[in-house]
């Protein structure tokens, strides 16, 4: 049962991160298209957002290993 829970947790976290990253990048591209002079600031904010979104699957993998280790 623990293996199934770990697989579901990792899968859902990866799905959410993929959707989140897609939204972040698409909105950044839209912003750069509207205001090219704000490119640097938008890219910096995008990278911070992507890093925060990617932390969720990493935490899910750690929790999955903890569940399997019991």
Swiss-Prot record:
Molecular function via GO = lipid binding; proton-transporting ATP synthase activity, rotational mechanism
Q: Which gene encodes it?
A: atpE
Looking at the UniProt entry, the stretches that span the membrane are 5-25, 47-67
Q: Which NCBIfam families match?
A: ATP_synt_c (TIGR01260), PRK06876.1 (NF005363)
Name by which UniProt lists this protein: ATP synthase subunit c
- PROSITE patterns given in the database record: ATPASE_C (PS00605)
Gene Ontology cellular-component terms for this entry are: plasma membrane; proton-transporting ATP synthase complex; proton-transporting two-sector ATPase complex, proton-transporting domain
> Topologically, how does it sit relative to the membrane?
Multi-pass membrane protein
Q: Where in the cell is it found?
A: Cell membrane
Q: Where is this site: Reversibly protonated during proton transport?
A: 54
Keywords assigned by UniProt, alphabetized: ATP synthesis, Cell membrane, CF(0), Hydrogen ion transport, Ion transport, Lipid-binding, Membrane, Transmembrane, Transmembrane helix, Transport
Keyword Metal-binding recorded: no
According to its UniProt entry, this protein's organism is Geobacillus thermodenitrificans (strain NG80-2)
